[in-house]
Amino acid sequence: MLIITQTALELGFLYALVAMALFLSYRILDIADLTTDGCFVLGAAVSVTATAAGHPVLAIFAAMLAGTCAGFVTAFLQTKLGVPSILAGIVTNTGLYTVNLMAMGWKSNQSLLGGKTVFTMLRETGIGGEWYELLLAAFVTLLAGLLLVLFLGTRMGLSIRATGDNPDMVRATSLNPSFTITVGLCLANMLTALSGAIVGQYQKTVDINSGTGIVVIGLACLIIGETLLGRRSVKKGVIAAILGSIVYRFIYAIVFYTKIVPVECLKLLTAIIVALAIAAPSIQKWATFQKRKMAARNKEGV
């Protein structure tokens, strides 16, 4: 049971970076960025390939740079070519499939058999004992979360937040919304690629299809966290992303351990939860309308 708890915490922290990326793109910028799936694999592919070449630390930064480039392409399609945000994400995601294959040497998967990773480097120092993987995962995620909160409190960060709320107001202050959108999407995809990079070294493998459904899982984590903490501020939003990811991984671990629901059906269950959570305001309005309608009929009947 201790191993299950440890693994759930490790994966919860690692995938929380994706939830934070979606918090930035979906909640702050109000953009449905579908680049996430391909960008996650891009980060993992670059990281594993560079690590196999003997550069595990450099691999992390290379993956982040690759993710930033993917975000820039998506933003360029939206802001300069007028492609709708959803289509821009789909187009970039489709192109990333070939880029990811190229990064893996035109193979559908790649592994690190006995190779040195950032995790093994930490283990060799003796820091963290048996919990060294959890220690590194928590450190990277919490540091990224802190930096994101601090960044969104700067002038540029406030401009990005304002762009999601009211682009016209941003234009009135002589700022270019296209620039703030580009910065926001680059940062979001950098976080996604960072998650893929760390996960790739954690699992010591990457597969071309390993990013399938990541955007839905990330949204589920974000929604779970917001349900528990709310979304009144940026700080709470980032904490909610981390907490939601950990809770989701514990749910996954419980389902896997108890077999209450077949593990093969978990992504379907996740998709249903996300759909219901996103549709909740509309469902609530419909329910309120029906109650008023019934109350009006009852009054007429009396």
Predicted regions located by residue number:
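Cytosolic-side transmembrane-helix boundaries in multi-pass membrane proteins
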Residues: D165-A172, N176-F179, I251-V302
